[in-house]
Every structure is written in C-alpha cells, then in structure tokens.
Curated annotation (Swiss-Prot):
<feature type="transmembrane region" description="Helical">
    <location>
        <begin position="451"/>
        <end position="471"/>
    </location>
</feature>
<feature type="transmembrane region" description="Helical">
    <location>
        <begin position="90"/>
        <end position="110"/>
    </location>
</feature>
<feature type="transmembrane region" description="Helical">
    <location>
        <begin position="192"/>
        <end position="212"/>
    </location>
</feature>
<feature type="transmembrane region" description="Helical">
    <location>
        <begin position="388"/>
        <end position="408"/>
    </location>
</feature>
<feature type="transmembrane region" description="Helical">
    <location>
        <begin position="233"/>
        <end position="253"/>
    </location>
</feature>
<keyword id="KW-0961">Cell wall biogenesis/degradation</keyword>
<comment type="similarity">
    <text>Belongs to the MurJ/MviN family.</text>
</comment>
<dbReference type="InterPro" id="IPR004268">
    <property type="entry name" value="MurJ"/>
</dbReference>
<dbReference type="GO" id="GO:0005886">
    <property type="term" value="C:plasma membrane"/>
</dbReference>
<feature type="transmembrane region" description="Helical">
    <location>
        <begin position="274"/>
        <end position="294"/>
    </location>
</feature>
<dbReference type="GO" id="GO:0034204">
    <property type="term" value="P:lipid translocation"/>
</dbReference>
<dbReference type="GO" id="GO:0009252">
    <property type="term" value="P:peptidoglycan biosynthetic process"/>
</dbReference>
<dbReference type="GO" id="GO:0008360">
    <property type="term" value="P:regulation of cell shape"/>
</dbReference>
<feature type="transmembrane region" description="Helical">
    <location>
        <begin position="413"/>
        <end position="433"/>
    </location>
</feature>
<keyword id="KW-0573">Peptidoglycan synthesis</keyword>
<feature type="transmembrane region" description="Helical">
    <location>
        <begin position="350"/>
        <end position="370"/>
    </location>
</feature>
<keyword id="KW-1003">Cell membrane</keyword>
Length: 535
C-alpha cells in the first residue's frame, strides 16, 4: 500500500470520526450552549480526553511502535507477543493504581489544578468533580487501546484503530438525542454524557482487542515486571509523553486560566472541535503512518527513502492544510453560526467562538507540521530533544496566556497557543536541518511558496464572497440557505485553490502518480520479503 493510500486510510477513518464529532457538538451546543453545565462537562472531559490524545496520538505509539517493530524483526511474532504481554501487565497495573488515586483526589485536582475559577460557584464545582469522577476510567480504556493500536499500526493494519474513536461520537449523539426526546434538564444531560463517555471507552477497547486477535496475536496477562524491554519503553515514553502531548498540556493550562471567566472554557472547546477536523484528518494520519514507515527505512539503512518520506509528508500536509487554515481565518463566523447557533448557543457566542477559530486557523499549519517533524526524532529513538522544545513551547504559552487573558479573554489564550505552536515547529525543523536529518529537497522548496500563493488567492476570493453573501450566511436566513451557501463557498474555494496550485506548479498529477507508484513498488518488495521469511 502506498504512503498516500495509507494516509487516506487513516485520514478517511479520522474524517468520519470528526464529522460525527461535529454532529455531537451541534447537539451539545443546542442543549447546553456555553452555560455553567457546558463549562463543567467540558472541563471534566478534558482531563481524561487530554490523556487519551496524549497516549493514543502521541507518547505511547511514538515509543511503543519502533520497539514492537524491532521485536517482530528480531524474534518474529512470538517475540512481539511476549513483549506486548510484558507491556500490558505493567500498563494495566499502573493505570489501575492511577485511576484509584485520581478518583480519590478528584476534588483537589479540579479545585486546585484544572479549574480553580470554579471554586466560587459551588454548583459548577460539584458538577465538574462528579462528571470527572465518572469519566476518568475512560483513560484506562483508551491507554490500553492505544497500545493495541500501536501493534496494529506496526502490522500495517490501520483501519480498526482509526475507526474506533467514531463510536464515542455515536454513543454521545444517541445520549443527546435521548435527552432531547425525554426533555431532560441541563444537569441530567451532563450526567448522561459522562456515563456515555465511559461506555464509549469500553466499546473502543473491545474493537481494537478483537482486531489484534484477528491479526494473530492473543495477549495474555503477565505479572508486571520491569524487563529490559519495558525499561527501554519507559525511558522513551516519558519524554515522548511530554513532547507528543504538548498541545494537550497547553490545553490543560489554558483551561485552568480560562476557568476564571464564564463561558471561556466552552468557547475554546467549540472552536477546538472545528479546528481539530483538519488537524486530525491530516496531522494524525501523517504522524500515525509516517513513524512506522520512517522507522522501517532507518532500520534498513535507506537514508534516501527516509528523507523522501519526510519531504513528501511535509508536502502533503501543507498541500491540504494551507487552504484549510485560510478558510478558517476568513469564514470562521459563518462556519460557527451554521454548526452551533441554535438553542442555548446565542449570536454573542458565535462572535466569541468565531474569533477564537480564526486565530486557530493561523496556527493550524504549525501544529500539523509538528506532527510531521516529530517522527524524524522518534524513529531515531531521540525523544529528549523534542521534550526540551516542548518545555520551551509550554513556557511561551503560559507566559503569553497569562499576559493576554485579562484584556483579550479566550482569544488571548488562543493567541498564546498558536505562538507556542509555531515556536515548537520552527525549533524542530531547525534541529533536523542542523543535524543533517533533513536533506535539501528542491521540489519541496519550490512548491511551498507556490502553495502559499494559491492559499492567499483563495482567501482573498473568499473574503470578497463572504462580504457579498452576508445575508444568506446570516442568522436571519433559513438554515438550508445558510448550509447551501456555505457549502457552495467551500466548493468554489477548493476549485480556486486546486486550479491555482496545479496551474503555478505547487502540485502536479505526475507527482501524485509517482508517490503512488513508489509506494506500491515498495509494498510489493515488502510483501515478497515477508513471503520469503514465512517460507
């Protein structure tokens, strides 16, 4: 399977999950708006969800995948199964102890670390603690699922791990639909959603567990022991946890700061949901596929192939991310209005969330590039350098957020996030170049400015069109009119971008065909080699 096809497999499944996530957030916005229960649930959910993103999309896969792949190469499937059982025993024990400790200390964690601003509102504080207590075991489910997803990715089976998250949205949509049908109040909806999150974690764990068994690996429980392999995993995973979870660390810090203002937490969450669509579809797909592919190339001593993988991944991410960033910058309010403005979500909320979303658009390329750059370190088993840069990024984020929040509120926090993201991305790239791990690639260097020009032309056209179509995009127009107008604008913008990008040489069909053929050829060789090994 070619690199592009692998990106498409993971990205397509992620796209499905994110689209259902939009439906979920639309229902939630109508039911809870940006009121106190919305703040309580979003804050409570951020705690396990932060660890979910960190483990499922960052630290665990980054550390586990290269070691698991090495075990397959050195000792075959039996060695890989033994290694996975050793890790499973330690991970399960740690998660059990962590869950118990967190459940017992949840009032302190919420009141002192996550949302100290809620202490002045006893009802909101109590709801947040209760919701978080119900949902926190979701972390254990998703951490175990992340381990199994890493195994599947190493075996080039991407679909099950990528599609599992959609079931969180399925279950929460069903919960919200039932709440609407039965006429529940906001607090009852918050309780139902919390139990729904826990149920979704169990379902997702079951899906990847079945997929691993179908792949031929049956994981048994071993008494937890710090074997050499497990120690190596922990050494790699700790700094990778900080590095891969930099966005999540920033989100937790920002939640702490935002809790001082009513509605700020929920406004950031709603904007983040929209911005996560392109970030998830492109960034997570690239990071998930690139790490095992890059590790394989480096193990084989194929430095040219490794350099080509990195360059084509950056090219691919920018080709899709730059127009998405431009669209978020220009069309933020119409997008938020269409998706969320109904029920308890007011026009004033649309303006606030729209401003935050436009700011996130400026940072989108940085966060996607981070996901493309980090595998260049992790595949070489260097997790320390990205950890240092992550620490610098956190310091930038915290200092700016504290400085800007008093005057700009939630928009100040969003600004701090994107500045920190760009600092992190630039440090990662500069270090790869300085160490000679990023070869000069003429096609990439010539295409990037052309893609920027294409995105700028598209943004200018959208700016004029949004002003000209102000009424069809306003809340005074029927929902169907707004939806058709926005979809038409997006389609026209895509046509303009692709026409300009291909027209001025930012992209070419021959480039795409070469990528597919190169990946198909590599896959054929890989399959032949695997067949010879089995014989």
């Amino acid at each position: 399977m070619s690199l592009v096809k692998k990106f498409a497999t993971v990205g397509g499944a992620t796209l499905g999950s994110r689209l259902f996530g939009f439906i979920r957030e639309t229902f939630m916005a109508a039911a809870l708006g940006t009121g106190p229960v919305a703040d309580a649930f979003n804050t409570a959910f951020r705690l396990p969800n932060t660890f979910r993103r960190l483990f499922a999309e960052g630290a665990f896969n980054s550390a586990f995948v290269p070691l698991f792949a090495k075990e397959i190469e050195a000792h075959g499937m039996d060695g890989a199964r033994r290694f996975s059982e050793e890790v499973f025993g330690v991970l399960f024990t740690v998660l059990l102890l962590l869950t118990i400790a967190m459940e017992l200390s949840m009032p302190f964690i919420v009141g002192q670390l996550i949302a100290p601003g809620f202490a002045d509102d006893p009802a909101k504080f109590t709801s947040t603690v209760t919701f978080a207590t119900i949902m926190f075991p979701y972390l254990a489910c998703m951490s175990l699922a992340a381990m199994m997803a890493g195994m599947l990715n190493s075996l080039h089976r991407y679909f099950a791990a990528a599609i599992a998250p959609v079931f969180l949205n399925f279950i929460l949509i069903a919960v919200l639909a039932y709440a609407w049908y039965s006429g529940q109040d906001a607090v009852a909806v918050g309780y139902d959603l919390s139990w729904g999150v826990l149920a979704a974690g169990l379902v997702q764990l079951a899906i990847v567990w079945v997929a691993v068994r179908n792949a031929g690996i049956r994981i048994g429980f071993r008494r937890p022991r710090l074997t050499p392999n497990v120690k190596r995993l922990l050494v790699l995973a700790l700094p990778a946890a900080i590095t891969g979870g930099i966005t999540q660390i920033n989100l937790l810090i920002n939640t702490n700061i935002a809790s001082a203002k009513e509605g700020a937490v929920s406004s950031l969450v709603y904007a983040d949901r929209i911005y996560q669509l392109p970030l998830g579809v492109v960034g997570i797909a690239v990071a998930t596929v690139l790490l095992p592919e890059l590790a394989r190339a480096l193990r084989g001593g194929n430095l040219n192939e490794a350099a080509n993988l990195q360059n084509r991944s950056v090219e691919f991410t920018l080709f899709l991310t730059l127009p998405a960033a431009a669209a978020l910058l220009v069309m933020s309010e119409p997008i938020v209005r269409l998706l969320f403005e109904r029920g308890q979500f007011s026009p004033e909320s649309t303006v606030v969330v729209g401003h935050i979303l436009a700011i996130y658009g400026l940072g989108l390329p940085a966060f996607v590039l981070i996901k493309a750059f980090i595998p260049g370190f992790f595949a070489r088993e260097d997790t320390r350098t990205p950890m240092i840069f992550a620490g610098i990024s956190v310091a930038v984020n915290v200092s700016l957020a504290l400085t800007l929040f008093p005057s700009l509120a939630a928009s100040g926090i969003a600004t701090a996030e994107i500045v920190a993201g760009w600092v992190n991305a630039l440090l990662l790239f500069a270090t790869l170049v300085w160490r000679g791990h990023w070869g000069r690639d003429i096609p990439l260097l010539t295409r990037i400015p052309r893609l920027v020009i294409a995105a700028a032309i598209m943004a200018a056209a959208l700016y004029v069109a949004v002003d000209w179509l102000a009424f069809p995009l306003s809340s005074a127009a029927p929902l169907s009119t707004r939806a058709l107008t926005l979809c038409g604008l997006i389609a026209a913008a895509m046509a303009i971008y692709f026409a300009v990008a291909f027209g001025i040489g930012g992209a070419s069909l021959s480039m795409i065909r070469r990528s597919v053929k190169r990946g198909a050829s590599a896959s054929s060789v890989e399959r032949a080699s695997e067949g010879a090994d089995r014989q």
